[in-house]
Amino acid sequence: MLKNHPKGLIVAFFTNMGERFGFYTMMAILVLFLQVKYGLDEKVAGDYYSWFYFAIYALSLLGGILADWKKQYKTVILYGQIIMFVGYVMMAIPSMSLYGTLGALLVISLGNGFFKGNLQAVVGQLYDDPKYAKFRDSAFMVFYMGINVGAFFAPFVATGIRNWWLETNGFIHDGSLPALCH
């Protein structure tokens, strides 16, 4: 399947798959986290979720402009990954205030903005070589499969982590309990 492709495709595949896995694991629990940790109602937590998504796509424009201006796509991608990592570490600080959490989300969205579109550009550049040009379409199919694989498994892992944590701390999660209340 990858026999006729440059080696950079497999790196891009796993990089994007890992990023999407981490991103969708967080997104699977973000609104619930905001509601439980900070007592936000559904609408306010949903608004923060929406603004976070908006920031990712708005800052992707900034990341693309920066990479085009500097002509250093891989460097911008690396900085994006580092910035996202810092944002995720900030999110992991347990005593953080709501403003700290929102700041962490902004840092994550900035890193994601530097990362998101530029990785696709690098994949396209791998196929500028005439030797690989005829494989460009299949390369993007493989590349986007990494996104789908990462996004598919993320909610299951988030649920598994939640269940493990509940059981480890002496709690039991029973999904049928809300139905018994009605």
Place the predicted regions along the sequence by residue:
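Central cavity-lining transmembrane alpha-helices of secondary-active solute carriers
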Residues: 50-68, 116
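Cytoplasmic membrane-interface "Motif A"-like loop-to-helix N-cap segments
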Residues: 69-82, 134
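Symmetry-related core transmembrane helices of the 12-TM Major Facilitator Superfamily/SLC fold
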Residues: 102-103, 168-182
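Intracellular juxtamembrane helix-capping segments at the cytosolic ends
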Residues: 114-130
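Glycine-rich segments within core transmembrane alpha-helices of 12-TM secondary carriers
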Residues: 56, 135-163, 174-181
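Cytosolic juxtamembrane N-terminal segment immediately preceding the first transmembrane helix
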Residues: 1-23, 99
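Short amphipathic helix-loop junctions that connect adjacent transmembrane helices
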Residues: 26-44
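C-terminal ends and interior cores of transmembrane alpha-helices
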Residues: 79-102
